[in-house]
Amino acid sequence: MQIVADVGGIPGKDCRGYCKYCYFRKVKPIEPLGCRYCPPNSVGCARCSEGICETGTEFKPSFLVMNEIQTSMMMNQGLNGEFKVNISGGGDVSCYPQLEELVSGINQFGLKSHLGYTSGKGIDDSEMASRLMNLGVDEVTFTLFADDIGLRKEWVKDPTPEASLESAKLFAENANLYAASVIIPGVNDGEVLRKTCESLESWGAKALLLMRFANTTEQGLILGNAPVVDGIESQSIEEFSSLVDEINKEYSLRVTGTPLGDPTINAPFIISKEGNEEYLQFLKEVTGEATIVTSKIAAPFISAVFKKIGANTVNVIGTNKDIACLMTREDFESIDLSNVKDSVIIPGRSFVHDKVVEDIFSRDGVERVVGRGPDTLSVDGELSSGMTDEEVIMEEIESFRDLIDAINFFGMRKV
């Protein structure tokens, strides 16, 4: 079982400055977006205001983080399996000034540590990587961008790229390194990407996550900061998915992508794919009638599942937003209500106030019932790289059962 150790930190401040491609760069002050956690009669709460910008918490003292770890351990004492501590935060954990002290304290509990996110910008000397591993760090998620000193200086804004790359190599050789690269067309794709993959493969890295660069609102920049980099046009979903497939075939390390996909196990939405119909028998019967509103990427997969189980009382509408969790009020306002049934299911984590979205779906004079579905319906490539197909399938079945529960509850047909 993983215990999250949140060390805090603010993007751009506690990471030695924004990476050139960072989706928090150029963020403008925004009104609260609204979400499921807002009070009933007002828009705005900690999650959909400072929470989404991750501006609320400075780096915490290590003793406070240790207290939180101890509390989590006590609360979960009866659970099976060993504990492992995932150190993460709003900044770059390698920039956390008390990182070695924290890891040492975790090690004294007899626990291993996972550095949940780092670009290595806080590592000025690769000896730090060796010390961290000696103190029990056995897993690292490392944003590499490219095995290229010049590109890391320019795009990651890394003051010591040589030390960072040497640290990544040490982590790969002596622990479990899960690398990541935001792909900027014309910058770190093509031969640069292949050189990076060759390095990771020779070092012994476990996996590489390719992340499509978000540079428009539709791609997920919902904080008023699009474009992050002028003049860069990101790949289409189809082009990016093809790139992930291609790189995965060429190298021995596991290559996944976000927002799509994981070719090794055919994720996400494994149960929607041809040849996997056997898993659909574990879904509940659909007795309600509803419209599911989701993202452009998820819509065809979700639609395929309901078509295969014969749920003709359910239709699926995809908005222009690529990622369902980043849908906002404007995405729902763009929907043609003539295609919407009397009950509507929206993504659980979408950023819109419950009352606001009810008003949006009733603006044509039809009073519709709006409910939220599960937070996720599958597993993103960021997480699936450490999972088997069976583990992802189990999560999908559980999530679709929850979605059908929501349809049957909110879309109960009148007798």
Across the structure, where does each feature detected by a protein language model lie?
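Auxiliary Fe-S-binding modules of radical SAM enzymes
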Residues: E201-V415
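Structural preference for beta-strand elements that scaffold enzyme active sites
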Residues: Q2-V4, E82-N86, K112-H114, E139-T141, ...
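Active-site beta-loop-alpha junctions enriched in small/polar residues
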Residues: I10, G90-D92, T118-G122, F145-D147, ...
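Conserved strand-turn element in the central/C-terminal portion of the radical SAM core barrel
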Residues: I149, S167-V192, A214-N215
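Flexible, acidic/Gly-rich N-terminal and inter-domain linker regions that tether
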Residues: M1-C48, I345, S350, E358-V366, ...
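Alpha-helix-loop-beta-strand connector modules within alpha/beta enzyme cores
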Residues: L99-L115, E162-N176, V229-L253
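Catalytic cores of alpha/beta
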Residues: D124-R131, P185-W203
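Core AdoMet radical
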Residues: V4, I10, K26-L102, I106-D124, ...
